[in-house]
Amino acid sequence: DYVEALEARGVPHLLVGGKTFYEREEVDAIRSALTAIEWPEDELSVYAAVHGPLFAVGEEELLEYHAAAHGFPPYRVPKDLPERLQPVARALETLRELHASRNYRPVADTIGRLIAATRAHAGFILWRGGEQVLANVLHISDLARRYEAEGGLSFRGFVDLLREAAGTTEAPEAPILEEGSE
């Protein structure tokens, strides 16, 4: 792949085309987490968010937690969990807190709190093409601000918008020009 070869050699470049914004793994990770925040009773969304790159909890721990807690209910996190299951509990507590406050603050603020709580900036920048990955993640916050500026009223509405957009292939990635490019 040309992009990977350019990135591996540190060659400044600007990709036009390629994967669309909504098909990117990092965008899917944020969308999954926002879906879990809006619908914490949706076990599949919660599983996807907690297992995905934001919380990065392993399958073994998730399956063990699921058996011990009878699911992934963010409002019924057991107190007597073994240490190896604490990352699951912390992730569920984060989702619960963000769910409880999501309608009392701007959508972009909830996204910012999610990114801060999971230290996503640090993780995403280490990915291949990390600057582009991080630009895409930050672009989601920009989309949230635009959504509200254009009259969007609810967190759920923004999540629905992201989910609908994921079914299309029209939006390009957030443009960034590599340092030193002209």
What are these regions (language model features)?
Residues D1-F55, E59-L63, P74-K79, E83, ...:
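Conserved motor-region signature of P-loop NTPase helicases/translocases
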